[in-house]
Protein backbone atom coordinates (compact mmCIF):
# COMPACT_ATOMS: atom_id res chain seq x y z
CA UNK A 1 0.00 0.00 0.00
CA UNK A 2 1.00 3.61 -0.52
CA UNK A 3 2.94 5.41 2.18
CA UNK A 4 3.91 9.03 2.71
CA UNK A 5 1.55 10.43 0.08
CA UNK A 6 -0.74 13.38 0.63
CA UNK A 7 -3.62 10.94 0.42
CA UNK A 8 -2.21 8.82 3.25
CA UNK A 9 -1.53 11.84 5.45
CA UNK A 10 -4.96 13.41 4.98
CA UNK A 11 -6.71 10.06 5.38
CA UNK A 12 -4.89 9.32 8.64
CA UNK A 13 -5.56 12.80 10.04
CA UNK A 14 -9.29 12.43 9.40
CA UNK A 15 -9.70 8.83 10.56
CA UNK A 16 -12.11 8.59 13.50
CA UNK A 17 -11.74 4.83 13.85
CA UNK A 18 -12.30 1.46 12.25
CA UNK A 19 -15.87 0.19 12.10
CA UNK A 20 -16.82 -3.46 12.82
CA UNK A 21 -17.23 -3.89 9.06
CA UNK A 22 -13.57 -3.06 8.60
CA UNK A 23 -14.38 0.23 6.89
CA UNK A 24 -12.75 3.45 8.04
CA UNK A 25 -14.96 6.07 9.67
CA UNK A 26 -13.63 9.23 8.05
CA UNK A 27 -14.38 12.75 9.27
CA UNK A 28 -15.54 15.13 6.53
CA UNK A 29 -14.29 18.68 6.87
CA UNK A 30 -16.57 20.29 4.28
CA UNK A 31 -19.93 19.09 3.02
CA UNK A 32 -21.30 20.72 -0.14
CA UNK A 33 -24.97 20.24 -0.98
CA UNK A 34 -27.32 21.18 -3.81
CA UNK A 35 -30.98 20.87 -4.70
CA UNK A 36 -31.00 17.44 -6.35
CA UNK A 37 -29.38 14.97 -3.94
CA UNK A 38 -30.17 16.68 -0.62
CA UNK A 39 -34.02 16.76 -0.22
CA UNK A 40 -34.29 13.00 0.38
CA UNK A 41 -31.36 13.11 2.82
CA UNK A 42 -33.03 15.83 4.90
CA UNK A 43 -36.28 13.85 4.83
CA UNK A 44 -34.44 10.81 6.22
CA UNK A 45 -33.05 12.95 9.04
CA UNK A 46 -36.54 14.11 9.95
CA UNK A 47 -37.83 10.55 9.97
CA UNK A 48 -35.19 9.69 12.56
CA UNK A 49 -35.54 12.88 14.57
CA UNK A 50 -31.97 13.93 13.76
CA UNK A 51 -30.45 17.36 13.16
CA UNK A 52 -27.51 18.46 11.04
CA UNK A 53 -24.52 17.90 13.32
CA UNK A 54 -22.18 20.55 11.92
CA UNK A 55 -24.16 23.14 9.93
CA UNK A 56 -21.08 25.38 9.93
CA UNK A 57 -19.28 22.73 7.84
CA UNK A 58 -22.15 22.54 5.34
CA UNK A 59 -22.60 24.89 2.37
CA UNK A 60 -25.40 24.88 -0.20
CA UNK A 61 -26.15 26.30 -3.63
CA UNK A 62 -28.51 25.63 -6.54
CA UNK A 63 -27.07 24.55 -9.86
CA UNK A 64 -28.37 21.34 -11.45
CA UNK A 65 -31.95 22.27 -12.30
CA UNK A 66 -31.81 26.06 -12.52
CA UNK A 67 -32.72 27.48 -15.94
CA UNK A 68 -30.00 29.53 -17.61
CA UNK A 69 -32.38 31.83 -19.48
CA UNK A 70 -35.52 32.81 -17.56
CA UNK A 71 -34.64 32.63 -13.87
CA UNK A 72 -37.76 34.47 -12.66
CA UNK A 73 -39.43 32.79 -9.69
CA UNK A 74 -41.49 30.72 -9.53
CA UNK A 75 -39.79 28.68 -12.25
CA UNK A 76 -41.84 27.49 -15.21
CA UNK A 77 -40.88 23.93 -14.24
CA UNK A 78 -42.93 23.30 -11.09
CA UNK A 79 -40.74 20.38 -9.99
CA UNK A 80 -37.61 22.53 -10.21
CA UNK A 81 -39.35 25.21 -8.17
CA UNK A 82 -40.39 22.63 -5.57
CA UNK A 83 -36.86 21.24 -5.25
CA UNK A 84 -35.30 24.66 -4.82
CA UNK A 85 -37.91 25.65 -2.25
CA UNK A 86 -37.08 22.45 -0.36
CA UNK A 87 -33.39 23.39 -0.28
CA UNK A 88 -34.21 26.92 0.82
CA UNK A 89 -36.35 25.59 3.67
CA UNK A 90 -33.86 22.91 4.70
CA UNK A 91 -31.02 25.42 4.87
CA UNK A 92 -33.09 27.91 6.84
CA UNK A 93 -34.31 25.23 9.25
CA UNK A 94 -30.77 23.94 9.86
CA UNK A 95 -28.86 27.24 9.78
CA UNK A 96 -26.86 26.23 6.70
CA UNK A 97 -25.12 28.84 4.54
CA UNK A 98 -26.96 28.98 1.21
CA UNK A 99 -25.87 30.78 -1.96
CA UNK A 100 -29.11 31.29 -3.85
CA UNK A 101 -29.72 32.84 -7.26
CA UNK A 102 -29.01 36.55 -7.08
CA UNK A 103 -26.72 36.28 -4.05
CA UNK A 104 -23.73 37.20 -6.18
CA UNK A 105 -22.03 33.91 -5.33
CA UNK A 106 -24.43 31.27 -6.68
CA UNK A 107 -23.19 28.83 -9.26
CA UNK A 108 -22.10 25.28 -9.90
CA UNK A 109 -21.09 23.86 -6.54
CA UNK A 110 -17.63 22.81 -7.75
CA UNK A 111 -17.00 26.29 -9.10
CA UNK A 112 -18.19 28.38 -6.16
CA UNK A 113 -16.47 26.48 -3.33
CA UNK A 114 -12.97 27.09 -4.73
CA UNK A 115 -13.64 30.69 -5.72
CA UNK A 116 -14.98 31.44 -2.22
CA UNK A 117 -11.89 29.89 -0.64
CA UNK A 118 -13.94 27.17 1.04
CA UNK A 119 -11.86 24.45 -0.64
CA UNK A 120 -8.44 24.25 0.98
CA UNK A 121 -5.46 21.86 1.09
CA UNK A 122 -5.63 18.97 3.51
CA UNK A 123 -9.42 18.90 3.69
CA UNK A 124 -11.75 15.99 3.26
CA UNK A 125 -14.70 17.12 1.15
CA UNK A 126 -17.92 15.36 0.19
CA UNK A 127 -20.82 16.28 -2.07
CA UNK A 128 -23.72 14.40 -3.59
CA UNK A 129 -22.27 14.83 -7.06
CA UNK A 130 -19.90 12.65 -9.07
CA UNK A 131 -17.45 15.42 -9.91
CA UNK A 132 -16.54 16.39 -6.35
CA UNK A 133 -13.04 15.20 -7.23
CA UNK A 134 -12.58 18.70 -8.73
CA UNK A 135 -11.57 19.98 -5.29
CA UNK A 136 -8.56 17.68 -5.25
CA UNK A 137 -6.78 20.32 -7.33
CA UNK A 138 -6.09 22.06 -4.00
CA UNK A 139 -4.56 19.04 -2.32
CA UNK A 140 -7.86 18.00 -0.76
CA UNK A 141 -9.35 14.50 -0.74
CA UNK A 142 -12.80 14.94 -2.23
CA UNK A 143 -15.46 12.31 -2.82
CA UNK A 144 -18.72 12.23 -4.72
CA UNK A 145 -21.36 10.45 -2.64
CA UNK A 146 -24.92 9.14 -2.95
CA UNK A 147 -28.04 10.43 -1.19
CA UNK A 148 -27.84 7.96 1.72
CA UNK A 149 -24.25 9.08 2.31
CA UNK A 150 -25.38 12.73 2.16
CA UNK A 151 -27.70 11.77 5.03
CA UNK A 152 -24.79 10.18 6.91
CA UNK A 153 -22.60 13.27 6.60
CA UNK A 154 -25.44 15.59 7.62
CA UNK A 155 -26.09 13.45 10.70
CA UNK A 156 -22.56 12.46 11.73
CA UNK A 157 -20.08 14.46 9.62
CA UNK A 158 -18.46 11.13 8.76
CA UNK A 159 -18.42 8.53 6.00
CA UNK A 160 -17.71 4.80 6.10
CA UNK A 161 -15.11 4.15 3.40
CA UNK A 162 -12.46 1.71 2.28
CA UNK A 163 -9.00 3.20 1.92
CA UNK A 164 -7.92 3.57 -1.68
CA UNK A 165 -4.69 2.63 -3.35
CA UNK A 166 -2.77 5.58 -4.81
CA UNK A 167 -1.60 5.80 -8.41
CA UNK A 168 0.80 8.58 -9.34
CA UNK A 169 0.08 9.93 -12.80
CA UNK A 170 3.05 11.96 -13.91
CA UNK A 171 2.90 14.22 -16.97
CA UNK A 172 6.09 16.02 -17.93
CA UNK A 173 6.98 18.68 -20.47
CA UNK A 174 5.28 21.62 -22.11
CA UNK A 175 1.88 21.33 -23.74
CA UNK A 176 1.87 22.31 -27.40
CA UNK A 177 -0.19 25.32 -28.55
CA UNK A 178 -3.88 24.43 -28.79
CA UNK A 179 -3.57 21.69 -26.18
CA UNK A 180 -5.35 22.34 -22.90
CA UNK A 181 -5.95 20.69 -19.54
CA UNK A 182 -9.09 19.06 -20.95
CA UNK A 183 -6.97 17.33 -23.57
CA UNK A 184 -4.60 16.09 -20.88
CA UNK A 185 -7.30 14.35 -18.86
CA UNK A 186 -9.06 12.97 -21.96
CA UNK A 187 -5.70 11.57 -23.07
CA UNK A 188 -5.11 9.97 -19.67
CA UNK A 189 -8.58 8.38 -19.61
CA UNK A 190 -8.19 7.23 -23.21
CA UNK A 191 -4.94 5.50 -22.29
CA UNK A 192 -5.83 3.99 -18.89
CA UNK A 193 -9.50 3.36 -19.60
CA UNK A 194 -12.72 4.28 -17.84
CA UNK A 195 -12.22 1.44 -15.36
CA UNK A 196 -8.47 1.79 -15.04
CA UNK A 197 -8.69 3.80 -11.85
CA UNK A 198 -11.16 1.60 -9.96
CA UNK A 199 -9.93 1.22 -6.37
CA UNK A 200 -7.46 4.09 -6.76
CA UNK A 201 -7.05 7.72 -5.94
CA UNK A 202 -5.01 9.53 -8.60
CA UNK A 203 -2.15 11.84 -7.65
CA UNK A 204 -1.45 14.11 -10.62
CA UNK A 205 2.19 15.19 -10.68
CA UNK A 206 5.01 16.22 -12.99
CA UNK A 207 6.20 19.42 -14.59
CA UNK A 208 3.08 19.78 -16.75
CA UNK A 209 0.83 20.03 -13.69
CA UNK A 210 3.31 22.30 -11.94
CA UNK A 211 2.90 24.75 -14.83
CA UNK A 212 -0.91 24.62 -14.79
CA UNK A 213 -2.99 27.28 -13.08
CA UNK A 214 -5.57 26.22 -10.49
CA UNK A 215 -8.47 26.22 -12.91
CA UNK A 216 -6.61 23.90 -15.26
CA UNK A 217 -5.82 21.58 -12.36
CA UNK A 218 -9.51 21.59 -11.42
CA UNK A 219 -10.42 20.49 -14.94
CA UNK A 220 -8.11 17.49 -14.67
CA UNK A 221 -9.19 16.48 -11.16
CA UNK A 222 -12.85 16.97 -12.12
CA UNK A 223 -12.64 14.10 -14.60
CA UNK A 224 -10.59 11.68 -12.49
CA UNK A 225 -13.89 9.95 -11.74
CA UNK A 226 -14.40 9.36 -15.48
CA UNK A 227 -11.26 7.23 -15.42
CA UNK A 228 -12.69 5.11 -12.62
CA UNK A 229 -10.72 6.77 -9.80
CA UNK A 230 -12.58 7.65 -6.60
CA UNK A 231 -10.70 10.93 -6.33
CA UNK A 232 -7.84 12.84 -7.88
CA UNK A 233 -5.53 15.45 -6.42
CA UNK A 234 -2.51 17.68 -6.99
CA UNK A 235 -0.07 18.51 -4.21
CA UNK A 236 -0.47 22.12 -3.05
CA UNK A 237 2.22 24.62 -4.02
CA UNK A 238 2.77 28.33 -4.52
CA UNK A 239 0.21 28.35 -7.36
CA UNK A 240 -2.37 26.98 -4.92
CA UNK A 241 -1.55 29.52 -2.23
CA UNK A 242 -1.55 32.48 -4.61
CA UNK A 243 -5.02 31.46 -5.80
CA UNK A 244 -6.40 31.10 -2.27
CA UNK A 245 -4.88 34.16 -0.61
CA UNK A 246 -7.44 36.88 0.07
CA UNK A 247 -10.49 34.80 -0.80
CA UNK A 248 -13.56 35.04 1.41
CA UNK A 249 -12.96 31.97 3.58
CA UNK A 250 -9.17 31.71 3.29
CA UNK A 251 -7.18 32.18 6.51
CA UNK A 252 -6.05 35.75 7.19
CA UNK A 253 -3.01 37.37 8.81
CA UNK A 254 -0.96 35.13 11.09
CA UNK A 255 -3.44 32.32 10.49
CA UNK A 256 -2.49 32.41 6.82
CA UNK A 257 1.19 31.82 7.57
CA UNK A 258 0.32 28.93 9.89
CA UNK A 259 -1.97 27.44 7.27
CA UNK A 260 0.68 27.56 4.54
CA UNK A 261 3.21 25.90 6.83
CA UNK A 262 0.74 23.09 7.56
CA UNK A 263 -0.26 22.75 3.92
CA UNK A 264 3.40 22.35 3.00
CA UNK A 265 3.72 19.56 5.57
CA UNK A 266 1.01 17.38 4.03
CA UNK A 267 2.52 17.22 0.55
CA UNK A 268 3.59 13.80 -0.62
CA UNK A 269 7.08 13.02 0.64
CA UNK A 270 9.93 12.89 -1.85
CA UNK A 271 10.33 9.19 -1.04
CA UNK A 272 6.59 8.46 -0.90
CA UNK A 273 5.59 4.96 -1.96
CA UNK A 274 2.84 4.51 -4.55
CA UNK A 275 0.83 1.47 -5.54
CA UNK A 276 1.38 2.32 -9.20
CA UNK A 277 3.10 4.99 -11.30
CA UNK A 278 2.23 5.94 -14.88
CA UNK A 279 4.24 8.52 -16.85
CA UNK A 280 3.11 10.57 -19.86
CA UNK A 281 4.94 12.96 -22.19
CA UNK A 282 3.02 16.22 -22.64
CA UNK A 283 4.41 16.64 -26.15
CA UNK A 284 2.51 13.54 -27.28
CA UNK A 285 -0.89 15.00 -26.33
CA UNK A 286 -2.92 16.66 -29.08
CA UNK A 287 -6.33 18.38 -29.15
CA UNK A 288 -8.64 15.51 -28.24
CA UNK A 289 -12.25 14.69 -29.12
CA UNK A 290 -14.41 11.84 -27.89
CA UNK A 291 -16.06 9.88 -30.68
CA UNK A 292 -18.12 7.38 -28.67
CA UNK A 293 -20.32 6.95 -25.61
CA UNK A 294 -17.72 6.94 -22.83
CA UNK A 295 -15.08 9.56 -21.97
CA UNK A 296 -12.45 6.92 -22.69
CA UNK A 297 -13.40 6.74 -26.36
CA UNK A 298 -11.25 9.68 -27.39
CA UNK A 299 -8.88 10.37 -30.29
CA UNK A 300 -6.73 13.21 -31.52
CA UNK A 301 -8.62 15.68 -33.69
CA UNK A 302 -6.66 14.57 -36.76
CA UNK A 303 -7.16 10.88 -36.10
CA UNK A 304 -9.91 8.52 -37.20
CA UNK A 305 -12.48 6.47 -35.34
CA UNK A 306 -10.57 3.30 -34.39
CA UNK A 307 -11.02 -0.03 -36.09
CA UNK A 308 -12.24 -2.83 -33.75
CA UNK A 309 -8.98 -4.73 -34.20
CA UNK A 310 -7.06 -1.69 -32.93
CA UNK A 311 -8.84 -1.95 -29.58
CA UNK A 312 -8.37 -4.25 -26.63
CA UNK A 313 -10.74 -7.19 -26.82
CA UNK A 314 -12.67 -6.05 -23.74
CA UNK A 315 -13.29 -2.65 -25.39
CA UNK A 316 -14.73 -3.96 -28.65
CA UNK A 317 -18.30 -4.59 -27.52
CA UNK A 318 -18.82 -1.04 -26.26
CA UNK A 319 -17.09 0.24 -29.41
CA UNK A 320 -19.58 -1.60 -31.63
CA UNK A 321 -22.39 -0.07 -29.60
CA UNK A 322 -20.80 3.37 -29.97
CA UNK A 323 -20.44 3.04 -33.77
CA UNK A 324 -24.18 2.37 -34.04
CA UNK A 325 -25.33 5.00 -31.58
CA UNK A 326 -23.05 7.78 -32.81
CA UNK A 327 -23.60 6.86 -36.48
CA UNK A 328 -19.86 6.83 -37.08
CA UNK A 329 -17.90 4.10 -38.80
CA UNK A 330 -14.44 2.65 -38.10
CA UNK A 331 -11.78 4.57 -39.98
CA UNK A 332 -13.92 7.72 -40.29
CA UNK A 333 -11.96 10.93 -39.59
CA UNK A 334 -13.46 12.73 -36.61
CA UNK A 335 -12.44 16.05 -38.12
CA UNK A 336 -15.23 17.32 -40.33
CA UNK A 337 -18.05 15.72 -38.30
CA UNK A 338 -21.01 18.10 -38.58
CA UNK A 339 -22.23 19.73 -35.37
CA UNK A 340 -25.69 21.03 -34.38
CA UNK A 341 -25.14 22.49 -30.90
CA UNK A 342 -22.08 23.92 -29.15
CA UNK A 343 -22.03 24.17 -25.34
CA UNK A 344 -19.32 25.93 -23.34
CA UNK A 345 -19.70 25.60 -19.57
CA UNK A 346 -20.01 22.98 -16.77
CA UNK A 347 -18.01 22.25 -13.61
CA UNK A 348 -15.26 20.96 -15.89
CA UNK A 349 -14.83 24.04 -18.07
CA UNK A 350 -17.07 26.90 -16.95
CA UNK A 351 -14.47 29.03 -15.18
CA UNK A 352 -13.11 32.40 -16.24
CA UNK A 353 -9.91 31.04 -17.84
CA UNK A 354 -12.02 28.62 -19.91
CA UNK A 355 -14.17 31.48 -21.17
CA UNK A 356 -11.11 33.58 -21.97
CA UNK A 357 -9.63 30.82 -24.14
CA UNK A 358 -12.92 30.29 -25.98
CA UNK A 359 -13.32 34.05 -26.47
CA UNK A 360 -9.91 34.21 -28.16
CA UNK A 361 -11.29 31.89 -30.82
CA UNK A 362 -14.66 33.64 -31.10
CA UNK A 363 -13.29 37.18 -31.34
CA UNK A 364 -13.77 38.68 -34.79
CA UNK A 365 -15.46 35.54 -36.11
CA UNK A 366 -19.04 34.25 -36.27
CA UNK A 367 -20.88 31.06 -35.46
CA UNK A 368 -21.61 29.03 -38.59
CA UNK A 369 -25.10 29.16 -40.05
CA UNK A 370 -27.53 26.74 -38.42
CA UNK A 371 -25.42 26.20 -35.30
CA UNK A 372 -26.88 26.85 -31.85
CA UNK A 373 -23.99 27.93 -29.63
CA UNK A 374 -24.19 29.13 -26.07
CA UNK A 375 -21.91 29.97 -23.16
CA UNK A 376 -22.91 29.30 -19.55
CA UNK A 377 -20.62 30.81 -16.88
CA UNK A 378 -19.95 28.51 -13.95
CA UNK A 379 -21.00 31.03 -11.33
CA UNK A 380 -22.34 34.52 -10.79
CA UNK A 381 -18.81 35.65 -9.96
CA UNK A 382 -17.45 34.16 -13.17
CA UNK A 383 -20.25 35.86 -15.11
CA UNK A 384 -19.51 39.20 -13.48
CA UNK A 385 -15.78 38.93 -14.19
CA UNK A 386 -16.39 37.89 -17.79
CA UNK A 387 -18.70 40.85 -18.33
CA UNK A 388 -16.18 43.20 -16.74
CA UNK A 389 -13.61 41.93 -19.25
CA UNK A 390 -16.09 42.24 -22.13
CA UNK A 391 -16.12 38.54 -22.92
CA UNK A 392 -19.92 38.50 -23.07
CA UNK A 393 -19.84 41.04 -25.90
CA UNK A 394 -17.21 39.05 -27.80
CA UNK A 395 -19.38 35.94 -27.60
CA UNK A 396 -22.62 37.71 -28.46
CA UNK A 397 -21.09 39.56 -31.41
CA UNK A 398 -19.87 36.19 -32.66
CA UNK A 399 -23.37 34.72 -32.46
CA UNK A 400 -23.14 32.83 -29.17
CA UNK A 401 -25.91 33.08 -26.59
CA UNK A 402 -24.75 34.41 -23.20
CA UNK A 403 -26.56 32.70 -20.33
CA UNK A 404 -26.99 32.76 -16.54
CA UNK A 405 -24.94 30.36 -14.35
CA UNK A 406 -25.93 26.72 -13.89
CA UNK A 407 -25.09 23.15 -14.86
CA UNK A 408 -27.05 23.62 -18.07
CA UNK A 409 -26.61 21.10 -20.88
CA UNK A 410 -24.00 19.04 -19.07
CA UNK A 411 -26.77 16.86 -17.69
CA UNK A 412 -30.05 18.37 -18.94
CA UNK A 413 -31.96 18.38 -15.64
CA UNK A 414 -33.06 21.82 -16.79
CA UNK A 415 -34.46 23.36 -20.00
CA UNK A 416 -31.11 23.13 -21.87
CA UNK A 417 -31.41 19.89 -23.86
CA UNK A 418 -30.51 18.38 -27.20
CA UNK A 419 -33.40 17.56 -29.52
CA UNK A 420 -33.70 14.26 -31.36
CA UNK A 421 -30.49 13.11 -33.05
CA UNK A 422 -28.68 16.41 -32.63
CA UNK A 423 -24.96 16.16 -32.06
CA UNK A 424 -23.15 18.54 -29.73
CA UNK A 425 -19.63 19.76 -29.25
CA UNK A 426 -19.47 20.09 -25.47
CA UNK A 427 -16.93 21.21 -22.89
CA UNK A 428 -18.62 19.04 -20.23
CA UNK A 429 -17.46 15.73 -18.79
CA UNK A 430 -19.79 12.92 -19.89
CA UNK A 431 -20.85 11.70 -23.32
CA UNK A 432 -23.14 8.88 -22.20
CA UNK A 433 -26.22 7.99 -24.22
CA UNK A 434 -28.93 10.56 -23.56
CA UNK A 435 -26.72 12.58 -21.21
CA UNK A 436 -27.69 15.92 -22.73
CA UNK A 437 -31.44 15.49 -22.65
CA UNK A 438 -32.38 13.55 -25.77
CA UNK A 439 -32.49 9.75 -25.65
CA UNK A 440 -30.88 9.72 -29.08
CA UNK A 441 -28.73 12.86 -28.77
CA UNK A 442 -24.98 12.59 -29.31
CA UNK A 443 -22.14 14.30 -27.47
CA UNK A 444 -18.53 14.97 -28.47
CA UNK A 445 -16.37 16.11 -25.54
CA UNK A 446 -13.56 18.59 -26.12
CA UNK A 447 -11.92 21.71 -24.67
CA UNK A 448 -13.78 25.06 -24.62
CA UNK A 449 -11.48 26.41 -27.32
CA UNK A 450 -12.23 23.38 -29.47
CA UNK A 451 -15.97 23.86 -28.90
CA UNK A 452 -15.65 27.49 -30.00
CA UNK A 453 -13.76 26.33 -33.08
CA UNK A 454 -16.50 23.81 -33.91
CA UNK A 455 -19.09 26.56 -33.53
CA UNK A 456 -17.25 28.81 -35.98
CA UNK A 457 -16.59 26.05 -38.51
CA UNK A 458 -19.88 24.15 -38.05
CA UNK A 459 -17.96 20.90 -37.68
CA UNK A 460 -15.23 19.29 -35.61
CA UNK A 461 -12.09 21.25 -36.44
CA UNK A 462 -8.55 21.71 -35.19
CA UNK A 463 -8.32 24.74 -32.88
CA UNK A 464 -4.71 25.22 -33.95
CA UNK A 465 -5.95 26.42 -37.34
CA UNK A 466 -7.55 29.45 -35.66
CA UNK A 467 -4.81 30.36 -33.19
From Swiss-Prot:
Signal peptide: none annotated. [4Fe-4S] cluster binds at residues 347, 407, 410. Its EC number is 4.2.1.33. Residues 422-443 are annotated as: Disordered. Gene3D superfamilies: Aconitase, domain 3. GO terms for molecular function: 3-isopropylmalate dehydratase activity; 4 iron, 4 sulfur cluster binding; metal ion binding. It catalyses: (2R,3S)-3-isopropylmalate = (2S)-2-isopropylmalate. The keyword S-adenosyl-L-methionine does not apply. One of its GO terms (biological process) is L-leucine biosynthetic process. The keyword 4Fe-4S applies. It comes from the Bacteria. SUPFAM superfamilies: Aconitase iron-sulfur domain. Catalyzes the isomerization between 2-isopropylmalate and 3-isopropylmalate, via the formation of 2-isopropylmaleate. Belongs to the aconitase/IPM isomerase family. LeuC type 1 subfamily. Heterodimer of LeuC and LeuD. This is 3-isopropylmalate dehydratase large subunit. The lineage of its organism: Bacteria, Bacillati, Cyanobacteriota, Cyanophyceae, Nostocales.
